[in-house]
Amino acid sequence: MSGAVCPGSFDPVTLGHIDIFERAAAQFDEVVVAVMVNPNKTGMFTHEERIALIEESTTHLPNLRVESGQGLIVDFVKARGLTAIVKGLRTGTDFEYELQMAQMNNHIAGVDTFFIATTPRYSFVSSSLAKEVATLGGDVSELLPAPVNARLKAKLAARD
């Protein structure tokens, strides 16, 4: 049985992320989305909210589950008996960074990373950009899963 992890902060999860999850789920028997804890970052959504939003947005993927993760991703992979890391790539800049990470993960733990090129319609989408546009009053409904868009609107309305 093959299993892979899709790690990230997902603050919030976007349709670009969902696209990568769907494509990974088609290639691996089991996919775990690891919502990584970063004590140096404060996000718009709490860690628990991010996990819940991904769960709500991926109910159509029976071989995918969402977990909290922290520390080295290779330790997460090994502890769960998974075999690979999956990362989405939007640009050459993403590739340069992710290639270094992939090589380090292979060096320290022998874990391979599989890269999935983002579908062109999502190639410009990032969590940061979606939050920025929404904060300035723009419509991001075509960039985010419906539950995420609704929760983002509610958070922004509560700030006003």
Curated annotation (Swiss-Prot):
ATP binds at S9, F10, H17, G88, L89, R90, E98, Y122, S123, F124, V125, S126, S127, S128. It is an enzyme of class 2 (transferase). Substrate binds at S9, K41, I73, K87. Keywords: ATP-binding, Coenzyme A biosynthesis, Cytoplasm, Magnesium, Nucleotide-binding, Nucleotidyltransferase, Transferase. Its cofactor is Mg(2+). The record marks H17 as: Transition state stabilizer. Pathway: Cofactor biosynthesis; coenzyme A biosynthesis; CoA from (R)-pantothenate: step 4/5. GO terms for cellular component: cytoplasm. It catalyses: (R)-4'-phosphopantetheine + ATP + H(+) = 3'-dephospho-CoA + diphosphate. The keyword NAD does not apply. Homohexamer. Belongs to the bacterial CoaD family. HAMAP family: PPAT_bact. This is Phosphopantetheine adenylyltransferase. It comes from Mycolicibacterium vanbaalenii (strain DSM 7251 / JCM 13017 / BCRC 16820 / KCTC 9966 / NRRL B-24157 / PYR-1). The gene is coaD.
